């Protein structure tokens, strides 16, 4: 049995499994997951091991609220292209790296971090990831990924990422993924905490780029941004969106009424 099979291919009952999620999430109710941490750290840091196994070890460590996992995420975010596993997982829609989206998923859940006293480091790992939002692809996760407390801690970093992204769009820089939609997703997340700010961020993006996909994602702000800003934003979307967007906006406005 390989080291990977022992650590992530065997459930906590000692049975082989081909579903790594059985192990990743089984750890939340199984203190014995701590016994696997030293081996996972060694696997993650071993250049002789396959990149996919090193990456999944990092995902496991971050999911389990381990210091080594969060520190690895921060290192990866500091120099994305040099990460050993960069481009090992590629998004089908845009044919770009999707490892940071998976790492963001791993960092988002803070239950074990609270238990292990690593919450501050978890937030720093989340900060490092959010700072990549204008340059790396996060699938469609950033709108709903982080809890409100984490979002508050990251608010300045989110604003800076959106600022950089808008400047990039204005300059006509070409990325291989849908940056405007990703920025709108961030604005949508912010709108739960600060409706006016979230709407302002989204409007800055839409004034530069407003594809049907971006507008469709922007609809979430209509119900998330409490107060008149959400309704005003919905009325704006009615003037620029297609039939699908308009129907979704009217539904959202109806719920908010």
Regions found by a protein language model. Name each.
Residues 1-188, 196-203:
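Extended repeat-based scaffolds of very large eukaryotic assembly and lipid-transport proteins
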Residues 1-18, 216-257:
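Eukaryotic acidic, Ser/Thr-rich intrinsically disordered low-complexity regions
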Residues 66-67, 151, 211, 227, ...:
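Alpha-helix boundary/capping and short turn/kink residues
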Residues 75-79, 208, 240:
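A short linear boundary/processing microfeature
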Residues 101, 105, 139-145, 184-188, ...:
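Alpha-helical solenoid repeat scaffolds
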Residues 167-171, 208, 248:
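Short secondary-structure transition/capping segments
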Residues 187, 200-209, 213-221, 232-236:
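Extended alpha-solenoid helical-repeat scaffolds
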């Amino acid at each position: 049995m390989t080291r990977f099979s022992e650590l992530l291919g065997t459930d906590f009952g000692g049975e082989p499994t081909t579903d790594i999620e059985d192990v990743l999430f089984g750890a939340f109710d199984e203190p014995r997951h701590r016994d696997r941490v030293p081996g996972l750290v060694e696997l993650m840091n071993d250049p002789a091991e396959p990149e996919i196994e090193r990456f999944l070890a990092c995902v496991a460590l971050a999911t389990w609220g381990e210091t080594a996992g969060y520190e690895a995420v921060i290192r990866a975010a500091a120099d994305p292209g040099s990460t050993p596993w960069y481009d090992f997982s590629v998004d089908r829609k845009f044919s770009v790296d999707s490892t940071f989206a998976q790492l963001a998923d791993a960092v988002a859940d803070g239950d074990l971090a609270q238990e292990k006293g690593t919450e501050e480091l978890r937030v720093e790992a989340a900060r490092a990831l959010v700072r990549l939002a204008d340059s790396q692809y996060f699938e469609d996760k950033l709108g709903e990924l982080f809890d409100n407390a984490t979002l508050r801690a990251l608010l300045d970093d989110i604003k800076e990422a959106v600022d950089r992204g808008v400047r990039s769009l204005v300059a006509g820089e070409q990325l291989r993924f849908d940056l405007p939609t990703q920025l709108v997703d961030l604005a949508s997340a912010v709108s739960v905490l600060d409706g006016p700010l979230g709407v302002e961020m989204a409007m800055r993006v839409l004034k530069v780029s407003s594809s049907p996909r971006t507008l469709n994602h922007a609809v979430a702000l209509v119900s998330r941004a409490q107060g008149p800003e959400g309704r005003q934003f919905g009325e704006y979307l009615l003037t620029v969106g297609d039939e699908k967007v308009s129907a979704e906006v009217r539904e959202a406005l109806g719920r908010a009424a």
